[in-house]
């Protein structure tokens, strides 16, 4: 097993980076990164199958058949794939099948890009939490392949999420939960039998929540839910047959939130 570990710390004006360690035996690669500080750039590229960018524990599951799954824990010392700081740039590219990536970002003005090419890959991203908001962060996710899954959870304000499934990408799952004011979510999907869940929660702010879905394909299941005290905007354009689309908006908490079910 190849292992790659990076520990990056920025304390005041001092920048310390641990050595990259790679052992050349065959098998899955594991990357576990902990970064503390501002204005850093992390670029990770994995080619092959069953590779892992690690951290933030394991679990998730759903089904019947709102699908999901995940159950990754592996990379360590003690798990990692975290960023604490602002104005950082993270780029993850995974090419292959059955890869996984989990990241937790706390801070503002960070940029996260995930590019997944292959089948049966799983990616989970968290920005902010109940004690730390993530402000003005940008998330860009691109999927090319089948049966992939991406989960994004964001707490904070003025965050943007953009997900693209390229032509011929089928049976994928995207779940965006944004507990934030002034959130923008954009989905561009070309493929069939995909599941998309988008939920925007919290006071919408003067500009409101915004969600744009552009769907080309058949048998896709799309559920969007927005709640907040101010304006919300949903722009939905679909081309194809047998798609199921659920749109719910409310000025208060949505009772019994729905989940997209596979067609």
Listing of model-derived features with the role each one plays in the protein:
Residues 1-263:
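Long, low-complexity, polar and repeat-rich extracellular regions
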């Amino acid at each position: 097993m190849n292992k790659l570990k990076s520990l990056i710390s920025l304390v005041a004006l001092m920048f310390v980076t641990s050595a990259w360690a790679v052992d050349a035996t065959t098998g899955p690669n594991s990357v576990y990164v902990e970064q503390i500080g501002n204005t850093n750039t992390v670029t990770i590229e994995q080619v092959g199958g069953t590779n892992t960018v690690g951290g933030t524990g394991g679990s998730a599951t759903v089904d019947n058949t709102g699908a999901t799954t995940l159950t990754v824990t592996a990379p360590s010392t003690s798990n990692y794939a975290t960023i604490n700081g602002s104005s950082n740039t993270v780029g993850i590219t995974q090419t292959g099948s059955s890869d996984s990536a989990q990241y937790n970002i706390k801070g503002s003005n960070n940029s996260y890009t995930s590019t997944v090419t292959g089948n049966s890959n799983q990616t989970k991203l968290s920005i902010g939490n109940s004690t730390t908001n993530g402000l003005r962060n940008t998330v860009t996710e691109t999927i090319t392949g089948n049966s992939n899954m991406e989960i994004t959870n964001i707490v904070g304000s003025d965050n943007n999420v953009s997900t693209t499934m390229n032509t011929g990408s089928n049976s994928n799952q995207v779940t965006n939960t944004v507990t934030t004011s002034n959130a923008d979510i954009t989905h561009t999907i070309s493929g069939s039998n995909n599941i998309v869940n988008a939920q925007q929660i919290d006071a919408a702010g003067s500009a409101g929540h915004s969600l744009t879905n552009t769907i080309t394909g058949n048998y896709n299941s799309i559920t969007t839910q927005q709640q907040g005290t101010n304006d919300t905007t949903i722009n939905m354009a679909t081309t194809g047959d047998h798609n199921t689309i659920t749109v719910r908006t409310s000025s208060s908490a949505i009772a019994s939130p729905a989940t997209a079910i596979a067609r």
